[in-house]
From Swiss-Prot:
PANTHER family: CARBON DISULFIDE HYDROLASE, CARBONIC ANHYDRASE. This is Putative carbonic anhydrase YvdA. Binds 1 zinc ion per subunit. It is an enzyme of class 4 (lyase).
Amino acid sequence: MNQMVSLTSILEHNQRFVSEKKYEPYKTTKFPSKKLVIVTCMDTRLTELLPQAMGLKNGDAKIVKNAGAIVSHPFGSVMRSILVAIYELQAEEVCIVGHHECGMSGLNASSILEKAKERGVEDSCLNLLTSAGLDLKTWLTGFHSVEESVSHSVNMIKNHPLLPKKVPVHGLVIHPETGKLDVVINGYETELINNHS
């Protein structure tokens, strides 16, 4: 592996970037100008595509990334980030943006655990985690339908006891080649239904 080559290259580029003041066009505040927090996937195809497809530029939104755009625990780091964005950083809406052809679709925990063993993680470590109550197979399992996964995450956020009831939570799926967005859940419509019931 060429870790040192990558880090060296990054640091060389960074030195030029700073000395040539290439950061100037990216200056903004920590507050998202579009009052939006987005949870999306770490897929490399979305790095530039997603902001372009959503009409976002630097400073418009808080973007939280993880494997699969999944909110897997109501008190995990993703949910904490959403709450911080809302209460401390002036975000007023949440978008979960999953994508087609996601690596988390059909992810098999056994495959990951085998690869971990091949790279030096010992059975004794896995056994210790299991005996401590961690269900590795569930924790490392993906989803079967991106739409269902997005809906599940939206519902977990929307029903969180610390989320203000008036915050719209949208669920979208993006195509990683074209950037086409499909709406799974329109948070405005959900809000209208809740206000009339």
